[in-house]
A protein has these predicted regions:
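Acidic, surface-exposed loops and disordered segments
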Residues: 1-133
């Protein structure tokens, strides 16, 4: 599929099938994220894959939407301000870098036939990545 076909295919999905995703697809998606460009190649991100029932229940407290509860997995994209590049006027590029990595994830998932949806309107105090087994 061409890039434009992939870009047309990728959209926010809010209804998910209750099935497992093959490990090969997960690895492929994470590799696409790892290859995402970042300012000065600092790669100030890390990813938390949440698949346990306990972890999913905790994460659902951060974003209590019915459609969100249907997803078989969650991938939390986290950024580290201590590792991100700051330009001369102190603009921190962590948000830009993690957004690029996130879209790499979404495009790779679409290519693999998987649906994704960015979630940005979550409770930041409840959503701490070390809380999700």
């Amino acid at each position: 599929m061409s890039f434009l076909e992939l870009a047309r295919k990728r959209c926010s999905i809010r209804k998910y099938a209750p099935k497992n995703v093959e490990q090969e697809k997960i690895d492929y998606i994470l590799e696409a994220a790892r290859l995402a460009p970042s300012a000065v190649n600092y790669q100030p991100w890390y990813f938390v894959w949440v698949q346990s029932a306990e972890g999913k229940a905790k994460l659902q407290e951060c974003y209590p939407r019915e459609w969100f509860k249907q997803a078989p997995y969650y991938l939390i994209v986290c950024g580290d301000h201590q590792q991100s590049w700051k330009r001369g006027d102190h603009k921190d590029h962590m948000d830009i870098d993690t957004a690029i990595a996130t879209e790499h994830i979404c495009l790779a998932a679409a290519e693999q036939g998987l649906g994704t949806c960015w979630v940005c309107n979550f409770d930041t105090e409840l959503c701490k990545p070390n809380k999700y087994p």
